[in-house]
C-alpha cells in the first residue's frame, strides 16, 4: 500500500505520523520519508489574547469579498471563462455595513473583543491610539498602520471614530514623512505620518508610525465598521517615505517572550488572536512548521500540490504560481485556475458567471473538501462546508437559491491568497523567527 502524505483529518486533527512529500526522479509519483516533529515552541507569560465575538447583523456578499481581494492585490480579472447564464438574478446588496458597536473596554486580564462583520469578511479588533479608541482590522497582508483622523473631510469621517492628534499626549509628527497605500481598483489611503502609542488589548508599542490620511477611497469610507488598519506583514511592505517604518508586529516583538501571533478564527464560534504565546488548548495534535519566504514582504509559503474531494491522486500545479500568501485581511481563497476549475468540476451545476463575478452553484449542492499543500510536507484540508460562502442570487427558471464559492480564481496573477476560509479550517501561528508558520487542526 502506498504511503500517504501527512494530512489534516476530517476533524482537522493531525495524523500521528509526519511525512515529507518528495518527487522521485523521472517519475510523477510521490514518495515519503519520515520527518520528526518540530522543536516545541516555548509557552510564554508575556502575551496578550484578543478575543473575538460574533457579529449577528451581517450581510453576506461573496462578489463584494472577491472584488475587495482583487483590489487589495491589484488583480485585474482576466482570462476567466464566464458563462452567459441568463437564468440568474443576483440579489441586490447594500455595501454600507452595519456599524459595529464600539464597546471596547478591555478587562483587567487584557482580553478585548474582536468582531467579524459581513459574513466574516473582516475580523475587527478594538485598538487604542494615543488614548483614543477605535475598531480596526488586523491584516497580515500589509504593513502600514493608519486610522481615520481629523484631517479627513466631514463626509469621509461620518460614521467612523476619529483620531485627533491634539488629544494625544504622546503624538508627534514624523517630519516630512508620507504614506500611500494604493489598491488595484484605485482604493487608497494616503497622507502624513505621526508617531504615537498604539495598544491592542495590552499589546503596546509606544512609538509606532501611524498613517493619518488626508484622503481615502470610497470603499474605506463606506466600511463604517472599521476605523483603519493594523498591518502585520513584514517591513518590506511598509509604504512610508522617504524612510520605511517598522510594522506594529515588528515593534511589538521586542516586548514579547516569543515573536508570534496565533490566529484562531473559527467559523461561527468565538476565536482569538494572541500575541506572544501559543495556547495548547486551541489546537489538536502537534504544531508543524512551514518555512516562510518574506522576500516580497508577505507571509508566503510554498504551495505546489492539491487534490479535491475523494480523489486519491495528488496533483502538482503545472500552470500558475507555486506559492501562497497567508492573509488574515482577505476573506476568500484565491487560487490558480487549475485548482479552482478542478474543484468546481466536482460540484453539480457549478459555473463561472459574469454577473456574479466568480463561481456559483445551487446552495443545496454537496461541496467536496479541498486539500492544498503547505510547504513540501503537508496538506491542509478545507472542509466542503466552508466553501459555501454566501447566497448570491436566484435561478429565474427554477427559483432555487444560488451561492458563491469560498474559493475563487486568482485570475492568473502572480499571487495565490489563502484568506479566512483557510483560517477557519486550521489554527495558524505567525512566527517572526525563521520566519515561519506553525499550523495544526483547531481544537
Swiss-Prot record:
GO MF entry, a single one: aspartic-type endopeptidase activity
EC number(s) reported in the record: 3.4.23.-
One CC-aspect GO term: extracellular region
InterPro entries linked to this entry: Aspartic_peptidase_A1, Aspartic_peptidase_AS, Aspergillopepsin-like_cat_dom, PEPTIDASE_A1, Peptidase_aspartic_dom_sf
Propeptide: 37-107
Disulfide partners: 363-403
Keyword Protease: yes
Record-annotated active site: 139, 327
Compartments in which it is found: Secreted
One protein family per Pfam: Asp
Residues the record marks as carrying a glycan: 180, 293, 364, 388
UniProt key word Signal: yes
GO biological process, one term: proteolysis
Top-rank lineage group of the source organism: Eukaryota
Record's keyword terms, sorted: Aspartyl protease, Disulfide bond, Glycoprotein, Hydrolase, Protease, Secreted, Signal, Virulence, Zymogen
Broad class of where this protein is predominantly found: secreted
Limits of the Peptidase A1 domain: 123-440
Gene3D superfamilies: Acid Proteases
Residues spanning the signal sequence: 1-36
Sequence similarity: Belongs to the peptidase A1 family.
Assembly and interaction partners: Monomer.
Function field: Secreted aspartic endopeptidase that allows assimilation of proteinaceous substrates. The scissile peptide bond is attacked by a nucleophilic water molecule activated by two aspartic residues in the active site. Shows a broad primary substrate specificity. Favors hydrophobic residues at the P1 and P1' positions.
Full protein name: Aspartic protease PEP3
Recorded name of the encoding gene: PEP3
